[in-house]
UniProtKB/Swiss-Prot annotation:
It comes from Acinetobacter baylyi (strain ATCC 33305 / BD413 / ADP1). This is Large ribosomal subunit protein bL31B. GO terms for cellular component: ribonucleoprotein complex; ribosome. GO terms for molecular function: structural constituent of ribosome. HAMAP family: Ribosomal_bL31_2 (MF_00502). Keywords: Ribonucleoprotein, Ribosomal protein. One of its GO terms (biological process) is translation. Part of the 50S ribosomal subunit.
Length: 82
């Protein structure tokens, strides 16, 4: 393999902010933030969702907050029935 062309593979601290869970995973991601975790300093990346908070993996059932366009239309104009 050629030297100097491959990204640096390192241990990175990922933080799922919804579940407040931390994961140390090998990655080539580049970040300017660092955090100390269990006595070591790691590059730090925040996540909105991971296996610790995703409904598929947690088994939670969530109601979708977005209604379809037809349902929104019907709700808005239901009072104008003939």
């Amino acid at each position: 393999m050629r030297q100097g062309i491959h990204p640096e593979y390192q241990q990175v601290l990922f933080h799922d902010t919804n579940a407040d869970a931390y994961f140390i995973i090998g990655s080539t991601i580049q970040t300017k933030q660092t955090r100390e975790y269990e006595g070591k300093v790691y590059p730090y990346v925040t996540l909105d969702i991971s296996s610790a908070s995703h409904p598929f993996y947690t088994g939670e059932v969530r109601q979708a907050s977005n209604e379809g366009r037809v349902a929104t239309f019907n709700k808005r104009f239901s009072r104008f029935k003939r």
